[in-house]
A protein has these predicted regions:
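Glycine-rich flexible loops
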Residues: 1-317
Length: 317
């Protein structure tokens, strides 16, 4: 259990850094004597020291089920060790990924610096020279969960998931944390300058400015045009309203020269996602070419039971 306590400390640190994890996003795990301890679906890494967030699963059973294409691997509910897990914890949607990678520790983060490359049409070519010397792999976009795991060939120490985020794997927590930091430094991008403007005509009753970067005009266009990573779509919808195209009371309104306007009653999870949207968009250059989700990819995510479950949890809507 000392290792689990250490994982909790690391998870809380990662979850408290908005440039690495937002709300209930991301997941972490450690393998210990045939047990896979993995963050439960919908739980916040930032709260790892305050409440039980890790589900215990029977690792040999998961690996056997994966080898036999058992449909139970879609949720992994059947492999939960009820004698070790706190009641009500549902395995992470990425449990098969955590189980199938051979390294003892796996950290999956929604690193803003990584996402700012991963959402680009030429993202793989962009990150290749920056990650030179590391054992890494680019993984084309696939719906999270079991389909994503099936696209991975184990053997790398880090994986850049197109339109999604970063996974690192190591045999110790220290090595995994160091690798997250290394990737963040190598992939860091500057914030694009935003014009300074008067808030007159932008401020709206029932809204406030998010604690996030101000956006350049091209960043507003990019962010409004569609969704390009899962949590953006699931918690904010496809794209975002702009100040000159507002209908009703959308959760987020974008205006050039300002951070996102967020509704006063916005729940904690979409509020965090609005900040992440700005953090990513503010790093995109005018000549970048974002790759947005297709209509089918959006449908597959928004109609997936795992995401419907996450949306149903307190603080998500």
């Amino acid at each position: 259990m000392d290792d689990l306590a250490a994982l909790a400390r690391v998870s809380a640190e990662l979850g408290s850094n908005r440039l690495l994890v937002q709300a209930a996003g991301g997941n972490t795990s450690i393998k210990d004597d045939g047990v896979l301890w993995v963050k439960a679906s919908g739980r916040w890494l930032a709260k790892a020291l305050d409440e039980p967030i890790f589900a215990a699963l029977d690792l040999p059973r998961i690996l056997s089920a994966l080898a036999h294409n058992d449909p139970a691997c879609e949720t992994c509910d059947a492999f939960v060790r009820a004698d070790l897990s706190a009641p009500g914890l549902r395995p992470s949607v990425e449990t098969t990924l955590h189980a199938g990678l051979p390294q003892r520790v796996v950290l999956h983060v929604h690193c803003v610096e990584t996402i700012s490359h991963a959402v680009l049409e030429d993202g793989a070519a962009r990150v290749a020279p920056l990650l030179d010397g590391l054992k890494w792999a680019w993984v084309p976009y696939t719906r999270p969960g079991l389909p994503l795991f099936r696209t991975i060939t184990p053997g790398a120490d880090l994986y850049v998931f197109a339109n999604h985020g970063l996974v690192v794997a190591a045999d110790t927590l220290e090595a995994a944390v160091a690798l997250v930091a290394t990737v963040g430094r190598r992939l860091a991008r500057p914030l694009q300058p935003a014009p300074t403007r008067s808030a007159r005509g932008v401020e709206r009753a029932g809204y406030r400015f998010a604690d996030a970067p101000a956006l350049a005009p091209h960043a507003v266009r990019f962010a409004a045009a569609g969704a390009y990573y899962p949590d953006h779509l699931v918690f904010l919808g496809s794209g975002a309203a702009t100040i000159d195209s507002v209908v009703g009371s959308p959760p987020v309104i974008l205006a050039p020269g300002f951070p996102p306007l967020v509704r006063d009653d916005l729940a904690p999870t979409p509020l965090a996602m609005a900040g992440c949207l700005a953090d990513v968009a503010a790093r995109l250059a005018p000549d970048d070419r974002p790759r947005y989700f297709t209509a089918q990819e959006e449908h597959d995510l928004t109609h997936w039971d795992a995401e419907i479950y996450r949306q149903s949890l307190p603080g998500s809507a």
